[in-house]
């Protein structure tokens, strides 16, 4: 009788543990692949869309994106960084790019006299400006240099963060160094800016968990798979990977070397894959979120 009770208890605990994993995974479900059934594009793995020869709804399947120049009905049917414009998939153009008023699509700008421009030369958002520029007081200006004043991270270069009103180098301070933000610490070694104001080891990183309270005050318990939930840090969202600093440096150097003004597959084909591999290798959102993880991973092969 005791043996039966023990077996029942083991089965019960197993079911509870599995259900905990499934509960966390409800917000991170597996997605349908090419030719698998779907109702909406959100059912499909990114960047696939729901729709095929059968159309949407009944009998629809997840389909590969339509290439540049192909007929389309919506943006999500086109390849990433393209847009459906005048029923055709078009490459997004950015500020300063040459354009055709009837055939081109200028992202966050308009085609004026053959060039993507901001009407009145007044910007309202950073995405209207070229790479390494941001919108400040209505003008697109170069990003602030290290040590310069700033009010947010987007005012600084990719290798800098805005901390205490100054652009400072990211991810370099060693254990025990005084910090105001985890962006200053060696996050790819598993460090964060602790409650004591010093760079400290985040001991729970990627340890197994059942709920957020298992992961510390700035951590979250996240579904990695149906059988495994792990702790991640919310302040930066970094993974422990010694290759990440060199990936970031390689991307930054590539953009300078190639003189790219936009970080897109067409605007900077040599550098964009480095950036996407960096995103997958170094941040849990891009490695664990199952709707997009394979897309990001494809750039690391």
From Swiss-Prot:
Coiled-coil ranges (or none): none
UniProt-annotated location(s): Secreted
Glycosylation-annotated residues: 19, 59, 102, 180
GO biological process, one term: negative regulation of canonical Wnt signaling pathway
GO cellular component labels: extracellular space
Secretion signal span: 1-21
Keywords: Glycoprotein, Secreted, Signal
Source domain of life: Eukaryota
Primary localisation category: secreted
MF GO annotations: co-receptor binding; receptor antagonist activity
PANTHER family: DD-GDCA PROTEIN, DICKKOPF N-TERMINAL CYSTEINE-RICH DOMAIN-CONTAINING PROTEIN
The protein's name in its UniProt record: Uncharacterized protein DDB_G0272530
């Amino acid at each position: 009788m005791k043996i039966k009770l023990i077996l029942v208890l083991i089965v019960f605990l197993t079911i509870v543990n599995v259900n905990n994993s499934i509960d966390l995974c409800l917000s991170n479900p597996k997605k349908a692949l090419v030719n698998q059934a779907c109702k909406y594009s959100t059912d499909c793995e990114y960047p696939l869309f729901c729709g095929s020869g059968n159309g949407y709804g009944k009998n629809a399947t997840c389909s590969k994106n339509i290439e540049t120049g192909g007929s389309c009905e919506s943006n999500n049917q086109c390849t990433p960084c393209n847009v459906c414009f005048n029923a055709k998939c078009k490459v997004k153009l950015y500020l300063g790019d040459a354009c055709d008023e009837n055939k081109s699509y200028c992202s966050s700008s308009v085609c004026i006299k053959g060039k993507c421009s901001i009407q009145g030369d007044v910007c309202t958002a950073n995405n209207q400006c070229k790479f390494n520029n941001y919108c400040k007081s209505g003008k697109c200006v170069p990003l602030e240099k290290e040590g310069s004043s700033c009010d947010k991270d987007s005012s600084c270069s990719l290798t800098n963060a805005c901390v205490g009103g100054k652009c400072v180098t990211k991810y370099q301070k060693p254990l025990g160094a005084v910090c105001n933000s985890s962006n200053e610490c060696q996050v790819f070694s598993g460090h964060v800016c602790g409650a004591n104001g010093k760079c400290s080891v985040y001991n729970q990183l990627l340890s197994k968990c059942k709920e957020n309270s298992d992961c510390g005050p700035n951590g979250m318990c996240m579904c990695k798979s149906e059988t495994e939930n792990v702790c991640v840090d919310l302040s930066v969202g970094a993974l422990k990977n010694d290759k990440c600093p060199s990936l970031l440096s390689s991307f930054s150097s590539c953009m300078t070397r190639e003189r790219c003004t936009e970080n897109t597959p067409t605007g900077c084909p040599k550098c964009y894959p480095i950036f996407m591999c960096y995103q997958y290798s170094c941040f849990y959102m891009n490695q664990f979120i199952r709707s997009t993880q394979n897309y990001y991973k494809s750039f690391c092969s």
